[in-house]
Structure formats: C-alpha cells, structure tokens
Amino acid sequence: MEVPRLDHALNSPTSPCEEVIKNLSLEAIQLCDRDGNKSQDSGIAEMEELPVPRNIKISNITCDSFKISWEMDSKSKDRITHYFIDLNKKENKNSNKFKHKDVPTKLVAKAVPLPMTVRGHWFLSPRTEYTVAVQTASKQVDGDYVVSEWSEIIEFCTADYSKVHLTQLLEKAEVIAGRMLKFSVFYRNQHKEYFDYIREHHGNAMQPSVKDNSGSHGSPISGKLEGIFFSCSTEFNTGKPPQDSPYGRYRFEIAAEKLFNPNTNLYFGDFYCMYTAYHYVILVIAPVGSPGDEFCKQRLPQLNSQDNKFLTCREEDGMLVYHHAQDVILEVIYTDPVGLSLGTVAEITGHQLMSLSTANAKKDPSCKTCNISVGR
C-alpha cells in the first residue's frame, strides 16, 4: 500500500485537519493531536460502538516500509470503512508543531485486510525510532467520520538499507567515478600520539574500531562494522599520495598488496557527499572468511576485485597492479588488525586540513547525485 505524500504547505498550522489528499483506495489526512484521544475536527464525530485496535503488531520492517496489524472486537466491525494511523518520530511524539522537517504524519487508509503495508520514503527514514497508534473509523454519506478511541502507542525502529538499496547507490556512484588512476600504497594519517599508543598498548598493531556515523543514515556499516580506515588517493601530477591530510601529520603507508589481494574480498559500503562538490565512496576490504567478511557478505554488495569502477587489483606480467577511481574520494575500511611493521610511519610535509574531515559527517539529503528514493 503506497502512502501518498503529505503536503507540507498546510493552509493553517492551527487547523491541520483541513488538508486532505486522496489517492484511489488510500487517503492521507493530517489530523489533530492525539491528546484527548478524539480528533477535534468538526467533520469527525464520536461513535463508541466502533472497536478500538489492540495488540498492535509491527512486522516486515524495512528502511521505508512496515506491515501493521491488530486485533479488535467483532462488534460493529462491519461498519469500519477506514483506519486512521498516527505515525511520529519517537522524539516528537508529544509535539504538535508543524515544521518543514519532521512533520507528524497522520494517515487515513481504506479498511483493507490486515496486515496492511505502510510505505513512504517521504515520511519514513532508515534506522529511526517511531511511535504509531491507530483508530478505526466509519465514513458517513455526508463525508463525516465516526471514530473509535485511539489504540495504545507502539514503538518500533526502521531498518538499515538492504543490498537492493545499496546496489542503487552503487549504480549512482559508478556514473561519476571517472577514469582509473594507478596507485601502489594505502595510507592512514593520525596524530603522533596514536601511533605511540599502538606501539605501547597494542603490540605494534592497529586494531579495528567501530565505524562512526558518517555517510548515509541508512548505511548498515555505520556504528556496526569494525575496521581500520585507509585512503589511496593520489595526486594527478605525481601519482603519489597527497601531502595534506585532515586526520593528522603522521602517516602510515603500506604496500597495496599487503591489504588488497586475491585472498581478500571487496565490498561497496556507501556513497555520499557533505554539502560540497566532493563525493565519497566507502569500500570495505575483508580477508576471505574473516568475521568482517561474513558481516559484509550478509549486508553489502560484493564487487569484482579485478573489474569495477572504484578500486581494482589485477595481475599483469606476474605482478599485482592497482588502480583507483579519479573523480570520487575513496574511503577504504580494512576489517582486520594491521601491524605497523608491515609499513612505514613518517611525518607529512603538507598541512592538516581539518575542514576536509569526514568524521561523523552528515550526508546532504538534497543531493540528487548521491541519494536514492528511500529514506535518507
């Protein structure tokens, strides 16, 4: 059941019930606040005989849809023509403010067999907590409604992007990836204190940590996947890593074949921007059969390491040759520990450009290049 968009351009912020949008078998209507249980609109009357929904159950949750069902007494059940569904983000469940963002969504659906699917990327975001309550209603010949009491309030959380959604992001990223440039090392910038700590407390090996919440809000790796962040960008004129970095003046460099080789798998993780012209692609490299590999295999689209638009490893004349996409900034996550003895640590000669950091960066939800038609 597709739910039509609720127009934010309400005629009167104090009279939300005036706005009704109809779409064949389904209608979306902005009702008054749930407080007091009854809607105050003059076109909706009370009728105690209508059954109140109880034991509400939410199932089949995705990033932008869910199924809802409930139980109700058979008394007057045949008089029900519509269901009123009050859906709000959890943090706004007691709010009746009509802003451009996070407008509470009240829906009216024709009474259909349960469970009923509620779908709509314009009011459902991934990985977000919501509250939902339901009324039963009977539409009268004059257009008025008689309604039941509101049900209890149920809470649920939407899901992450699925592989299908990530594949859509992948396809959009491929469009702008550009030509491939040769490279030979992965690198990771940090402060000197970071590397000192690794040597003293972690046996000279960098340890995976949980990825932050940068990028798409629905990305299944944010706050869940453990890994170590690397870059592989090169300067166009030198073919070497740039001397500037937003992450620290000390750089660990490691030969590309130490991290990316036939014994690893490559996955697409995300595609985003931060209100700038730069676009970022997150890739994950995981040793075959490792915990990180199993995590990604269940959640992320796998890429052909020898043939993709972002990062390749091919054998030429008995040697592994590496290329990266020119027109996107790659953020590479390696899912296993990496010993400092496998590479070198040295101070860079450039600047620490903090403004370019993507730590916990929020994705621009309005960018047409890197967004898909599901919750942002």
UniProtKB/Swiss-Prot annotation:
GO cellular component terms, A-Z: cytoplasm
Glycosylation, residue list: 23, 37
Keywords: Glycoprotein, Phosphoprotein
Pfam families registered for this protein in UniProt: fn3, PHYHIP_C
All copies of domain Fibronectin type-III, residue ranges: 52-161
Keyword Phosphoprotein: yes
SMART domains associated with the record: FN3
InterPro entries: FN3_dom, FN3_sf, Ig-like_fold, PHYHIP/PHYHIPL, PHYIP/PHIPL_C
Superkingdom of this protein's organism: Eukaryota
List of residues that carry Phosphoserine: 12, 15, 25
Coiled-coil region(s): none
UniProt xrefs under Gene3D superfamilies: Immunoglobulins
Similarity annotation: Belongs to the PHYHIP family.
Function: May play a role in the development of the central system.
The name this protein goes by in its record: Phytanoyl-CoA hydroxylase interacting protein-like
Gene: PHYHIPL
